[in-house]
Structure formats: C-alpha cells, structure tokens
Amino acid sequence: MKKMMMMAVLAIVAMTASAQNTLRDNGTFTLQPKVGLGIGYLSGDWTMPAGVDRKSRVGVVAGVEGEYYVNEWFSAALGVNYAQQGWKFDGGGSKVTTKLDYLNLPITGNFYVAQGLALKTGVQFGFLLSAKEESTDVKDAFESLNVSIPIGISYEISNFILDARYNLSLTKANKNSTSDNKWRSDLIQITVGYKFEL
C-alpha cells in the first residue's frame, strides 16, 4: 500500500517537472468528476489471532468534487464519492472478506505549491451504506459514521487531475468495541478526474 502511494506521488512530481498548467483566476469554480482505485485496510487497536494474516481490500472509488479558488495558491473543495473499503483475514484454513461501502463527503483545503501541484488536507465524513462479511449482512455490527483526515497530493495538466490521498480514520468502525479491540477503516485512494470551469 505504501509503495503504491509512493509511486503515485513520484509520478505526480515527475509530471510537474515536465509540464505546464494554466493558473486559475480568483473566484473560479470548477467541477471535477473522478474515478479510481481504493485500497482499504484495517487499523487501530486489536489482537490478531495466531496464524491469521490481515490483508487489504481493493475496490472502486468514484464521485465528483467542486472546488472554489480563493486565490492563485489556495482553494477550498467539497466532494461526494462512493468508496469500497474494508479488509480481509486469511488464516486458519479460511478467508473472510469484510466489505464496507461508504458514501464519503471530503472537505479539503488545497495549497498550490507549484503550477498545477497541490497539497491538500481537511476532514471527511463517511456514511456507511452496507457492510458484509462474504455474503452475510453485518451492518448492525459497524458504526454508521466514519470520520477521517484526508492527506493528499494532486497534479493537473490540461484539466486532467491525478490525485493520491491517504484517509486516516479518527473513529472506530466496530460497535461494542473494547479498549483492546478498536477497528478503524482507513483508505488509500488514487483517482483520475477532469475539471470543468463553471
């Protein structure tokens, strides 16, 4: 997961060194449909059973983001996206996949440190749409709200946007958790989008 995130960051930096992009005027508003890959995994405090490995769940991320340019170096963005999150347990002769699907609402501040290159952070509210272990509905076992901090980088060229983010969950995912059994649903996402000026 960390290697994939690092590769995305290096790709963005490489594009920055070899391409130019037009600065947007103050007060410009853009709308950006986006789609990409999400890598969900389990973090937090818990005791892993002996012989059981934790793995990531790879899924789809798709949505739209509106962005308002306050000036040449700062903008504020509000988005909505569907994200397939979760994790897998492999061991003891069985494999169990926990599928958590969220409707996420990210609110970010974007700092343009170079032409087209933005660093971003903020807060994201995730609303649980469904939760399954294999084909069994387990939504009642998980919290309906997931609050996280998105930390990301993006690069724009000819209105196309490559965006890489790590969403660090602040709230526990599982209900009835104990002090040594608090699960968090984190997400790494890499998306490609296109900006339309309105």
Residues covered by each model-derived region:
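Residues that define the transmembrane beta-barrel architecture of outer-membrane proteins
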Residues: 27-31, 54-60, 99-103, 143-149, ...
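Repeated loop/turn-to-beta-strand initiation elements of outer-membrane beta-barrel proteins
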Residues: 74-76, 117-119, 159-164
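Transmembrane beta-barrel strands of outer-membrane/channel proteins
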Residues: 33-39, 80-82, 121-127, 155, ...
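Outer-membrane beta-barrel translocator domains and adjoining extracellular loop/strand segments
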Residues: 43-50, 88-95, 131-138, 174-179
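Short glycine/proline- and aromatic-enriched beta-strand/turn motifs that initiate or cap beta-hairpins
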Residues: 20-67, 167-169, 195
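Outer-membrane beta-barrel channels and translocator barrels
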Residues: 26, 71, 114, 157-160, ...
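Membrane-embedded beta-strands of outer-membrane beta-barrel proteins
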Residues: 62-64, 105-107, 119, 151-153, ...
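Predominantly the C-terminal beta-signal and adjacent terminal strand-loop region
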Residues: 85-88, 138-198
